[in-house]
Amino acid sequence: MDIYKGTGAFSGIAIGKILYYHKSEYQMRQYEITDVKTELNIFRQARTRVMEQLEDLYEKNCIIQGTQAEIFLRQKNLLEGKSFQRAIESVIQSEKVNSAYAVMTTRDEMLKTFRNLEEPAIKERLDNMREISDRLIGELGGISPRIDLGDEPVIVVTESITPTELMEMDKDKLMAIVTHHGSDMSHAAIMAKTMNIPALLEIDTDSEWDGRQAIVDGYTGTLYIDPDEEVKKEYEIRRQADKEEREELLKLRREPDITKDGRKIEIYANIGNMDDLNSVLYYGAAGIGLLRSEFQYLGRENYPRENELFLAYKKIAETMGEKLTVIRTADLGADKQAEYLNIPDETNPIMGNRGIRLCLDRKRMFKAQLRAIFRASAYGNLALMYPMISSEEEMDEIEEIIREVKIGLDEKGIPYKHIKTGIMIETPAAVMISRELARRVDFLSLGTNDLSQYTLAMDRQNPLLRKKYNDHHPAVLRMIQMVIEAGHAENRRVCICGELAADTALTEEFLRMGVDCLSVVPACILPVRKALRQVDLSGDDKGA
């Protein structure tokens, strides 16, 4: 029996046979063509088919994966981009070679040009470029991109895995994931959580493990190769206990969000598209604490029309009924790009023109979304929330735009309700002026994912920093405490969302800080509810 220690990206236990997944880029034979026009048509038709495949993959996966499935839309956007298309067609025309070979050489040239850049956003873009190139080559060469896991459930071991590879695996055959590269905050790791699949990272994987028996312990980050009978028996018992615990959690679906001493601390859901609505209701969330509205802007060739936005928000409002739905205005930019937005390349897009900054630059887009939200407010209980606020001057601009939107609706006799507004506190600047910001809105919501990385000055998806990245850092927790105190000083509700809100190791600490609500992905509602119901805040003034 061999034992390997890594990092558990998602807890759980898997026992079974290993399938080692070999990643290889498609290599195509070069041959000369005589009819350039026909070859260009072959390429363009394949490009159209791949874009349709990516759209289908998004629609099939968004119900379970939510915002993680948006990677298919980002890949579709890259494929729609004229620069990539022109580069490939230029090779076909100038070198008179087959289209599959032209795609391969264009891919290789791009990867060679940017291979030494460590900027995570660029690396993700290159990964997407590699994947869509391989899809194109596969389509042109008649090769299926689907990863065959065989007939029986397996533990997939590989050097690294991308979200698209993970989503294309048969979920019924996938028991666990073990990789050498990656971080517990990567898109693939977060996706494993939503799929309830145990995942281990930073394991020195070996292709010779293929076909051997293994145990994955996501709790301790341990991998056992060829486990002995005693260890296997122990883990069979633990796996059964895991199953029973999940069944117990399901009994909490209709239980109230109250502490042992009767304090009500509501648990809301974070969702990234309309298909997540079913899981919000299934797990008994108090409402939607964060609706990421970017899904309406990605994977398309132009801005969504106001009426399209309105109909989506109206459906959400009607579905949720009296339950609150907080719509965050479009947080575009950074890793959420679309060709039609024409956002210039930035050295550091995470720190660049994104969120409210981009909305204030694109006022026509911003007003269309605001009008749609106000119109939909007549059909339910909606609230507005602004992302990436860092100054009162931004709030001045927003308030003027809101005033103009309301005047326009009034002039046309379009009904709307009073909408509560809130701010995402996700920058240190916003933390330091959180009391001033609280006076401008009805509630505050702590976006802990961005707040943590900006506070620590570390990219949370950079694998080189994984061991140093600590979102439990005292500085992060003190900032959260500061915002809660600032909000309460102005009689404003303060909610925590993001990965930290779902961390049950912090649930009691957040409650003792005085947080009013938590907002988590639907799959985490029940574990957080269980943790919350075990806390006793008796005698704690902040919990009152």
Question: What are these model-predicted stretches?
Answer:
Residues 1-141:
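Conserved, well-structured core domains of diverse proteins
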Residues 2-28, 141, 148-153, 157-282:
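Acidic, glycine-rich flexible loop/linker segments
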Residues 45, 105, 184-187, 275, ...:
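An amphipathic alpha-helix/helix-turn recognition signal
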Residues 48-63, 77-80, 84, 90-97, ...:
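Generic secondary-structure signature for well-ordered alpha-helical cores
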Residues 65, 78, 100, 126, ...:
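Conserved phosphate/pyrophosphate-binding and hydrolysis machinery centered on Walker-type P-loop NTPases
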Residues 112-150, 215-239, 437-468:
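N-terminal-biased segments
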Residues 134, 190, 311-314:
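Residues on a specific face of well-ordered alpha-helices
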Residues 246-544:
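Conserved alpha/beta-domain cores
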